[in-house]
């Protein structure tokens, strides 16, 4: 019995030592800064949404986006800032699951504000990404591998599914006088994919 307990203790120690102290501090501070910037940006976005052409739709979509974004940053900050133990392992699952919510939340304004009347593209992609996000979030509470390639592929697939509607997205953004937003979206997606590739590699960067 003692040996079993000792082995379990060593297992928990290994599971909770994925990052060294420098990496944990860097992750905690960077995601904490994301919370602060997200709250500030959220206030600005909500104010603009309320003063826009379709204020009810705009405020609702921005609220969903902020929920997804902040849930990701809050869960990651809490996870990396917590002490090793069972709580940290639970927070790790929330951290991974919240990425799905972040991706789906980011899609919401583009699908329901920009492409809501684009022949079914808006509602179709909205339904797909949110169904994927809910399923992904639930599955995140299964036992996670240290670097799950399947999980990374799911993140990238969700993020890239907008490519099937690239033409209607560009056209509707242009009609709204927001053409440059398309390139910001592409830049953000490319940055995310590059980051996902680096994350999936079993390499220490410190």
Predicted regions span which residues?
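Multi-pass alpha-helical transmembrane bundles in non-GPCR membrane proteins
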Residues: 3-205
